[in-house]
């Protein structure tokens, strides 16, 4: 008998053998009865033989499955938290690529923006999505927001009316702190630029938000009913400095589509009319 075998034989397992285990007389280790792989290993350290417990093959498979489920749950909770924080209107949850009806050819640009996000982020490249009312600009931006949020990327989609309501009544320091907090998001999406009130205070705060984002070197997406000509030919200095900041970093994308909102409303009215005409009034007796 060798010296190594003598040591191994002299040392007994440091725990009881369970019903689903057996003791291997060859290497003196406990094995799993199901997969026939060891649940112990042998180490020699400073002349002493140590026999710690390890996972057998089937235990390792169960562990990996449970670990995958745990990570998936954590990821789902993270995404849920990001969406709660980043999508301030519940309707935005439905603005996803899977809900696209295929009538907007420009949607491929939204796909490309998401696919090339790391490069867009690195270059602080944003989008200026412009076009008539109801053509799907918010849906376009929302698809980008949801796709990135599903990847665990912090996105905030809001509008200046909401931002201005928050800033109104704040002290100067608090306003700056709030505006700076918007830069915690990897992508900031401002929906419907131009519908906010046009006071001096509003214009100043709109510029502060845009300028802060510009200086943070993080991408910004803007949607607006304003035309590119109106943005390039601002009526005054206050608007010009806002638009210049946007145009410097945001790639213009025109959504030249039918009025989807009007089409949907018309379809809903037709369906309601059909229901009214095809159904008899309930018996009131």
Spans of model-derived segments:
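Walker A/P-loop nucleotide-binding motif
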Residues: 121-141
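Hydrophobic/aromatic beta-strand patches that form the interior of the parallel beta-sheet core
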Residues: 127, 156, 189, 221, ...
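Walker B catalytic acidic pair
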Residues: 192-193
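A short, basic N-terminal segment
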Residues: 1-101, 265-285
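Pre-Walker A (pre-P-loop) alpha-helix and adjacent loop at the N terminus of AAA/AAA+ ATPase modules
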Residues: 87-91, 96-127
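Loop/turn-to-beta-strand initiation segments
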Residues: 153-154, 184-187, 216-222
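Short glycine-rich substrate-engagement loop in P-loop NTPases that contacts/grips substrate
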Residues: 105-114, 124, 145-185, 197-204
């Amino acid at each position: 008998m060798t010296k190594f075998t003598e040591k191994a034989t002299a040392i007994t397992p440091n725990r009881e053998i369970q019903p689903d285990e057996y003791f291997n007389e060859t290497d003196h280790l406990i094995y799993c009865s199901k997969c026939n792989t060891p649940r112990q290993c042998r180490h020699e350290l400073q002349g002493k033989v140590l026999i710690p417990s390890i996972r057998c093959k089937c235990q390792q498979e169960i562990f990996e499955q449970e670990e995958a489920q745990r990570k998936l749950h954590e990821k789902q909770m993270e995404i849920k938290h990001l969406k709660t924080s980043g999508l301030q209107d519940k309707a935005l949850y439905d603005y996803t690529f899977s809900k696209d009806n295929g009538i907007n050819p420009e949607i491929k640009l939204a796909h490309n923006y998401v696919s090339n996000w790391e490069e867009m982020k690195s270059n602080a490249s944003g989008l200026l999505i412009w076009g008539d009312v109801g053509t799907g600009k918010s849906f376009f931006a929302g698809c980008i927001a949801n796709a990135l949020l599903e990847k665990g990327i912090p996105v905030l989609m809001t509008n200046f009316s909401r931002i201005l309501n928050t800033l109104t009544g704040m002290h100067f320091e608090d306003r700056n702190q709030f505006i700076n907090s918007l830069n915690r998001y990897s992508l900031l999406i401002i929906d419907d630029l131009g519908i906010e009130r046009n006071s001096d205070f509003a214009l100043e705060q709109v510029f502060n938000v845009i300028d802060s984002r510009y200086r943070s070197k993080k991408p910004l997406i803007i949607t607006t009913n304003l035309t590119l000509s109106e943005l390039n030919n601002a009526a005054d200095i206050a608007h010009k400095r806002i638009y210049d900041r946007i145009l410097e970093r945001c790639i213009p994308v025109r959504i030249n589509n039918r009025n989807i909102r009007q089409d949907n409303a018309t379809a809903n009215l037709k369906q309601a009319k059909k229901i009214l005409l095809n159904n008899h009034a309930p018996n009131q007796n």
